[in-house]
Amino acid sequence: MPESATGVALNTIEVRFTGGMLALNRLLMTLQNKRMPVAGFTLGSDNDGMRATILLDCPPESALRYTALILALEDVSEAGPAEPIEMALIETSKDWREPAERSGIETHEDGGTVVASGEPQKVEAFLAALGDGVEDAVRLGPVARPEVRGGA
């Protein structure tokens, strides 16, 4: 997880927008021109448009003000706080099932690679519990927790 430069907790916001690359450019220019304290940025797309997960390194009150500015952009359909999730792909020689259960994270194995996901602090605790048993790890996050839309 990126470290906070200001000593306050990082605030995660999720922004949904349509309009392709021009809309993305407007969002990025807004982040830059308003000097928003961006600590992390993840972009994804689906059938409904694009989704950006932004980590802001500022107090919660400032994050809400920045969210209001972003929500005012013409291409933005939604913007608001999001619960972060971290993912890790791990190769380990240790048994990972018990530490995963104790840490309270979701895990499964796919082709010899352990896929772990959960709250950033819990993923960190899981990796610490594995200790030197981790042969290789790739970490992604924190990102916004996936949201189920329209049932299913």
Please describe what each predicted stretch is:
Residues 1-10, 19-50, 55, 60-152:
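Long, contiguous binding/interaction regions
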